[in-house]
């Protein structure tokens, strides 16, 4: 089997630390045939991936991990683009981020005002207008300037204590966005039971297949062997491609969570892409 790790994060994801070239260097050393950068709601590292593929002789499949929702809970879809994602996907990702950030900020400001904190919507809008899509977020920058959140840890603790949750775009819309950008859509880590994200059974996957889902991430560090076998059976029954990857973000002691530690059959994926 020619191995592919089709779920890797670079520093284009806010919670990841690897430079694109670091990923390729490790992938080459570990004998991978192909890899994908699946950064959260970002395709910023794909250009580097396409350039590095020739240097390291490792095939690169441009990708993204889109934050979405299903059944009232967060869910994720992986987009894969044989010819690179079209600019329309960038617009979709930006709109998705902008919408969620504003919804959360409005709810958070209302919460803070209810706690007697002097912060206004007008102040937030001025901060957002200056740098809406940058990191850290406009809400963090505003609360930091006003001395409400001294650092990111304080801000995150404030977020958690508020209990506010805002759902991203519905999963079928994310699937459509992948198709509109010339790619395929794969359900990410369907069995990753964190108590927060949605855990998928065959009925839900079948519903998404009807909505255009192309595949299932069968192989993932969070899946047990039994789950891998069950999701493989579901994928085969529904005619969906089976993908997999390490979901690597930062250096980890668990080998299955590092580059190439979890993988799928590159030729099977390639065959599906070339249909």
Model-derived regions: residue spans:
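A short, structure-level motif marking secondary-structure boundaries and short turns
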Residues: 7-9, 33-35, 93-94, 123-125, ...
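Divalent metal-binding pocket/active-site signature
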Residues: 17, 102-110, 115-199
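Charged catalytic cores and adjacent phosphate/nucleic-acid-binding surfaces used
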Residues: 1-14, 20-30, 44-85, 145-146, ...
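An N-terminal domain-cap segment
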Residues: 17-18, 37
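A generic structural signal for short
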Residues: 11-12, 37-38, 96-97, 127-128, ...
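Mid-domain alpha/beta scaffold segments of enzyme catalytic cores
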Residues: 22, 33, 40-103, 107, ...
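Short beta-strand segments at enzyme active-site cores
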Residues: 36-37, 245
């Amino acid at each position: 089997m020619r191995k592919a790790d089709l779920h890797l994060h670079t520093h284009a994801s806010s919670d990841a630390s690897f430079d694109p070239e670091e990923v390729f260097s490790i992938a080459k050393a570990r004998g991978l045939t192909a890899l994908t950068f699946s950064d959260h709601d970002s395709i910023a590292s794909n250009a580097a991936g396409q350039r590095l593929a020739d240097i390291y002789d490792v095939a690169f499949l441009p990708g993204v991990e889109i934050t979405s929702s299903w059944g009232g809970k967060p869910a994720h879809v992986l987009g894969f683009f044989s010819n690179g994602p079209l600019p329309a996907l960038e617009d979709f990702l930006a709109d998705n981020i902008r919408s969620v950030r504003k919804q959360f900020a409005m709810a958070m400001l209302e919460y803070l005002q209810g706690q007697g904190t002097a912060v206004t919507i007008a102040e937030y809008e001025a901060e957002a207008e200056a740098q809406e899509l940058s990191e850290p977020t406009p809400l963090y920058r505003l609360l930091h300037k006003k001395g409400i959140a001294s650092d990111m840890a304080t801000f995150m603790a404030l977020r958690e204590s508020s209990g506010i949750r805002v759902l991203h775009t519905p999963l079928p819309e994310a699937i459509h966005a992948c198709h509109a950008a010339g790619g395929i859509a794969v359900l990410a880590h369907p069995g990753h039971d964190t108590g927060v994200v949605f855990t998928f059974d065959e009925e839900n996957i079948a519903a998404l297949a009807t909505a255009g889902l192309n595949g299932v991430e069968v192989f993932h560090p969070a899946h047990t062997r039994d789950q891998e076998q069950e999701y493989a059976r579901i994928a085969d029954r529904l005619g969906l491609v089976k993908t997999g990857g390490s979901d690597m973000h930062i250096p980890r002691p668990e080998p299955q969570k590092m580059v190439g530690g979890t993988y799928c059959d590159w030729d099977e994926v390639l065959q599906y892409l070339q249909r």
